[in-house]
């Protein structure tokens, strides 16, 4: 699970995530990239839910599909995600109640403006066009102000809210806060913050890794 905060308007999209991945017991497992950009499609792919699934889809979309632009990609995405999800669940022995949502944000090859879509496993990955505006997952207060300045505060609130939930229901958020800023000219990756326990989590990650490998 992850923090995902995004904002879209006709000429730009901002997609921000944390970087912490945890083991099944909630202990820090690794730091990872949770959103990526495909330059030749002018498209950002991100996801929540089953860790790593959206990254596998990004690799598939960027190297194994003959498509031109986000609308063309969107046409093929529901079928492609459905097939990949079945393989992914078997490979990682996921239970039937496991869920994931994949998001795609891109510059339209038709209009030159930002378009975005969500694909939820609970809805058979059907394409859901998203309106311009702000999206947050998990829930938090949508603040006003400079977006890159307020996103870290919003993620801190998300993490505080999740910390009050039972471990098996909690979304674990941590590491660094990375924002992707997409315009018609390209995409910039920007570190806009980090969590106060970043160093402690990094130490725990290497300690856990050493225990597993020794």
Where does each model-flagged region fall?
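Conserved short S/T/G-enriched processing/targeting/catalytic segments and their helical context
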Residues: 2-90, 122-214
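Structural motif
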Residues: 111-116
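Accessory structured domains or lobes within enzymes
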Residues: 92-93, 102
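Short hydrophobic alpha-helical segments used for membrane anchoring or interfacial signaling
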Residues: 103-110, 180-182
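Generic beta-strand structural signal
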Residues: 43, 98-103
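Short helix-terminating capping/connector loops at secondary-structure junctions
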Residues: 94-98, 172
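Long, charge-patterned amphipathic alpha-helical coiled-coil/hairpin "stalk" segments used as oligomerization
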Residues: 97-100, 118-126
């Amino acid at each position: 699970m992850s923090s995902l905060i995004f904002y879209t308007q006709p000429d730009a999209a901002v997609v921000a995530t944390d970087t912490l991945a945890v083991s099944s017991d909630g202990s820090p497992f690794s730091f990872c990239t949770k959103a990526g950009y495909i330059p030749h499609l002018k498209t950002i792919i991100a996801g929540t839910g089953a860790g790593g699934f959206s990254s596998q889809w990004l690799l598939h979309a960027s190297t194994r599909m003959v498509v031109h632009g986000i609308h063309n990609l969107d046409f093929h995405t529901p079928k492609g995600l459905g097939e990949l999800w079945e393989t992914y669940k078997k490979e990682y022995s996921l239970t039937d109640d496991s869920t994931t949502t994949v998001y795609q944000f891109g510059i339209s090859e038709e209009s030159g403006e930002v378009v975005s879509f969500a694909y939820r496993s609970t809805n058979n990955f059907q394409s859901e066009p998203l309106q311009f505006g702000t999206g947050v997952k998990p829930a938090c207060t949508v603040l006003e102000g400079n977006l890159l300045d307020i996103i870290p505060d919003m993620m801190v609130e998300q993490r505080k809210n999740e910390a009050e939930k039972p471990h098996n229901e909690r979304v674990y958020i941590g590491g660094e806060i990375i924002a992707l800023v997409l315009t018609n000219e390209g995409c910039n990756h920007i570190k806009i913050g980090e969590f106060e326990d970043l160093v402690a989590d990094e130490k725990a990650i290497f300690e856990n890794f050493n225990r597993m490998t020794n």
